[in-house]
Design a protein with these regions (language model features):
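Sec-dependent signal peptide recognition
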Residues: 2-8
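C-terminal motif of bacterial Sec signal peptides marking the signal peptidase cleavage site
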Residues: 15-16
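Solvent-exposed N-terminal domain segments of exported/luminal and surface proteins
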Residues: 20-51
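Catalytic cores and adjacent binding grooves of peptidoglycan-active enzymes
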Residues: 21-26, 146, 150-295
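Extended, low-complexity, intrinsically disordered C-terminal regulatory tails
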Residues: 39, 91-123, 192-214
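Active-site acidic/histidine clusters and adjacent loop/turn architecture
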Residues: 42-111, 171-180, 185
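Extracytoplasmic
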Residues: 103-105, 129-133, 222-224
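Short, surface-exposed glycine/acidic/tryptophan-bearing loops
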Residues: 123-141
Length: 295
């Protein structure tokens, strides 16, 4: 509690400075960035801009997704992670409306986007730092009048069985169509979902398969799917992830499934993974100091 008070006090002082304060920046530069960004409760009064990469950056001028809209509800509001670049907020408006219009759901339940100014989070994600990552619950949004309290208690629904090798009986054509709509959007760079879902979509898709390229298998991601948007036009300080390899990616997803069902033996000579050092403010793009300093 004392540490959090000191962090917040430093941030208040930093934001109150009308000019760049190099001494304070030096003192804060060695602090874990998650404590600096995790202590801020609102977005910066700046022109919207993502700075850095999805797992090492921040976002200026983020918008807050309304807690409830005509076709969505933001979940787990206590986390204060319903902030994103305006492109991400517009994407949610569009995709949730399409889900309601074409998939028979009332809309979408939206999980984590970013903190008010992005940056590393106190708990959970390594990415979601520049306001362009969106978690969308697999649970059908059948009730868009959930109270704040209910949204803290309710959980999404897992779609996997056999540790993610296959979808379970709760998987539906609607899930396929909503993920297809998200992947078909030109703003989308990637979608992460558990391997069994990707393989199932590969089997079920009978039409255009180009969108499958953006759907990539990844661990977890069975209670939600994760949409990653490309850097917006003109965002010169934003770093895109390398695009997926050409093709529909179905063979790669099948390899993931084989490895789940028949795990390869561990390599006794594999080097031990060194734990990653925590991200400090000094390791983030220099623009992130200004994002913290802004009103």
């Amino acid at each position: 509690m004392v540490f959090r008070f000191l962090i917040i006090s430093s941030l208040i002082w930093l934001s109150a400075c009308s000019n760049y304060d190099p001494d304070l920046v030096v003192r804060l530069s060695t602090k874990e960035a998650k404590h600096l960004f995790g202590a801020i409760e609102r977005g910066s009064e700046q022109r919207p801009a993502p700075h850095g990469s999805y797992a090492k950056g921040c976002v200026a001028g983020a918008d807050q997704l309304a807690e409830t809209g005509p076709t969505w509800q933001a979940m787990r509001l206590s986390r204060n992670r319903n902030w994103g670049h305006p492109v991400a907020i517009d994407f949610i408006h569009d995709l949730s409306a399409k889900a309601e219009r074409e998939s028979g759901w009332n809309g979408l339940y939206i999980g984590d986007i970013s903190q008010p100014r992005g940056g590393p989070m106190l708990t959970g994600h390594a990415s979601h730092q520049i306001g362009l990552d969106i978690d969308i619950w697999m649970r059908p949004a059948d009730d868009l009048t959930l109270s704040v309290k209910k949204r803290e208690a309710i959980s999404s629904i897992s779609m996997r069985r056999a540790n993610g090798a296959y979808v379970n009986e709760k998987w539906s054509k609607q899930h396929h169509n909503i993920i297809k709509a998200a992947a078909s959007d030109p703003r989308t760079a990637r979608i992460f979902v558990f391997p069994g879902a990707k393989v199932q979509m590969c089997k079920d898709e009978k039409g255009d398969r180009a969108w499958l390229n953006k759907v990539r298998p990844w661990w977890g991601h069975h209670y939600h799917f994760h949409v990653r948007l490309s850097c917006p036009a003109g965002a010169t300080n934003c770093k895109n992830q390398a695009p997926p390899p050409p093709g529909d990616g179905c063979k790669d997803a099948e390899r993931w499934v084989r490895d789940i069902l028949n795990p390869p033996p561990p390599n006794p000579n594999a080097p031990k993974r060194k734990p990653k050092p925590p991200l400090t403010l000094a390791l983030l793009p220099q623009q992130c100091v200004g994002v913290l300093q802004s009103n």
